[in-house]
Amino acid sequence: MCGIVGILGRGPVVDKLVASLRRLEYRGYDSAGLATLEGVRIERRRAEGKLRNLEEQLRYCPPSGHAGIGHTRWATHGKPTESNAHPHATENVAVVHNGIIENFRELRAELERNGAGFNSETDTEVVAHLVDSYLKNGYSPQDAVQASLPRLRGAFALAFLFKANDDLLIGACKGSPLAIGHGRGEVYLGSDAIALAPLTDTVTYLEDGDWAVLTRATCVIYGADGSIVQRETSKSGVSALLVDKANYRHFMAKEIHEQPTVAGKTLAHYLDVAAKRVALPLALPFDFNCIQRISITACGTASYAGHIAKYWFERLARLPCDVDVASEFRYREAPLRRGDLAIVISQSGETADTLAALRYAKGKGLHTISVVNVPTSTIARESESVLPTLAGPEIGVASTKAFICQLMVLGVLAVRAAKERGKLSEIDESQLVRELIEVPRLIAAALLVEPQIEKLARYIAGARTVLYLGRGTSAPLALEGALKLKEISYIHSEGYAAGELKHGPIALIDEAVPVVVIAPYDEVFEKTVSNMQEVAARGGKIILITDAKGASEAMVDTLLTIVLPAMVASFTPLVYAIPVQLLAYHTAVARGADVDQPRNLAKSVTVE
């Protein structure tokens, strides 16, 4: 969601602040701002809309302070206006914030009774006035923050800049990530290592409840109880080159085309390629023979990866599997058996609802595995076992390469579970591993259909509604295709299991409705053809994604048939996801949409 950066520099920090905010744009935002210390005075610059609007403000009279904080805001409390943009400040302190202060109304009422004047609709401004109230009573900045933090309910990451203190930043986090970067004579705060990538690769991640007092020479971290704690400092592994578009127009295009490479890299991490067997890089603390049920929780695209994995765990390992949207998991009061397995999936490893689901599952005594793209994330740190995807930083808000790598990891884990439970022979395991090893090559081949899809996208761009249909493992992929299209092109789209067509969605079909059918030639292909015939009979325009056998057997008029390489049916979603992603991307481009930063969306959703 919101992005935070703070810098104590050796020279003017404004350019570094703006550059770091630029790297945080991928998180999603609708306003931006920064504050620097100019002599003893805090100076703020804020702007509604894109970062370029803030840069325009800074162009003619840039601040020269050597200490500052910056922020990209994704509106939660109050409209996306300049007055609601961060930093929020009093005369004595400025603050930037990611998260939600749940008790801000009662705190605001108390502060207003004591004479505080508010200029915004936000929950964050309460934090500035609360800290300021302690400063006015003679507290030091450190003591004022320490006194304020226990009074805040909710999830937050905070960075504070203080009047007349050009060698002091204070950061705090609870339920939202915050990282400290260490440079030569400089120190940094950031929402993640990507924000700090060109400045430093030496990073310390604060843990839940931590707060830190930073100077250019010292970094003291306190736990929630106020005692000094030690946190591990490590190399971030995030290169500035990895957050560059290279020669691509958009990050999403770059990330789609990186998928053969990152899929191969992820597979190499989890397979013994020479022996054609699964070789996890860690020992799982349980035996799959003792697991009676798997619970998978995730949000958005990651949840569709979970739905596809459900087919694999149940078919291959004969292991019952539930899939829940993370925001609902805690509330449906499902009977969970101690000793069973919960798998949580999150690209960022910071998704608030998924983190809450993880904690709920742990509280019920389940073993926990996280599938995350950031192995230093909160979800990773709190999981019993971590299976990282090796997708590299994903900047585009619409997930592509992380989704494919999530499927890779889950597919490998399903094979491991099946083998451990005696449902696969060594020959069976070897065959499935061979199929997985082929996937990067098949993804590369699938990318060759891009010119066809680019032409098709110009037609889809004029549609008001698009339907996606699929059966088996293609049904969740239909849901993912619809999500991709709607989130970046803003065209209304829905995905359905093809068998559900006649139970409602068929009412939408007419000559103006494109219907994307994902149908590899498999055991349910003939049934999917029947659904296509129902669409054709009502004038719907069919776009069929299949293989050569499917194309020859369909015998249905289509607007376009996209032919993918033939492959064994087990892992088709890993390849059939490619044209689905490309169609969403090129349709969004054709409509002139902001592909990498679609409106109202955030890459890392760190509030519930």
Swiss-Prot record:
This is Glutamine--fructose-6-phosphate aminotransferase [isomerizing]. The keyword Cytoplasm applies. It comes from the Bacteria. GO terms for cellular component: cytosol. Keywords: Aminotransferase, Cytoplasm, Glutamine amidotransferase, Nodulation, Repeat, Transferase. The active site is at C2, K603. PANTHER family: GLUCOSAMINE--FRUCTOSE-6-PHOSPHATE AMINOTRANSFERASE, ISOMERIZING, GLUTAMINE--FRUCTOSE-6-PHOSPHATE TRANSAMINASE (ISOMERIZING). SUPFAM superfamilies: N-terminal nucleophile aminohydrolases (Ntn hydrolases), SIS domain.
